[in-house]
């Protein structure tokens, strides 16, 4: 978990975990967020303790507490790509994301997940573009799914 963790950066709907006996509790974001919950927070969403195994080995709600590198913004992503490839890559990204999400990603309104960054890099490679895609900026955040 980041040392400068800000509880208020988590979505209000983020489910907390109360299972302190879980074998993976020290690595689970849901448990770590629960431990850092401010007393001013009157109500939170929690995972039903009866729904998960007590050891947490096969927990479907587990989220790794290590932040990953998200990209933000694609305004200049295609600037150094040949025009013929630009048109094809842009069309493929819109087909992948959908028009609304594509433009939200371009305008820094939505973070671009690591898997999505890999997909875009694959589009570049398939068009013969050897340069690594450069997004507007990068930010460490937790992969919430």
In which residue ranges do the predicted regions lie?
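N-terminal positioning helix adjacent to the helix-turn-helix/winged-helix DNA-binding module
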Residues: 69-73, 98, 116
């Amino acid at each position: 978990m980041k040392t400068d963790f800000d509880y208020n950066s988590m979505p209000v709907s983020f489910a907390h975990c109360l299972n302190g006996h879980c074998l993976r509790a020290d690595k689970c974001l849901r448990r770590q967020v629960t431990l850092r919950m401010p007393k001013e927070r009157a109500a939170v969403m929690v995972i039903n303790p009866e729904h998960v195994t007590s050891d947490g080995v096969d927990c479907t709600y587990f989220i790794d507490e290590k932040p990953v590198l998200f990209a933000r913004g694609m305004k200049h992503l295609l600037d150094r790509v040949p025009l013929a490839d630009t048109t094809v890559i842009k069309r493929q990204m819109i087909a992948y994301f959908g028009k609304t999400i594509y433009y939200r990603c371009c305008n820094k309104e939505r973070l671009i997940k690591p898997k999505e960054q890999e997909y875009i890099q694959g589009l570049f490679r398939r068009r013969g573009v050897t340069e690594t895609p450069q997004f507007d900026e990068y930010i460490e955040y937790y992969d919430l799914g």
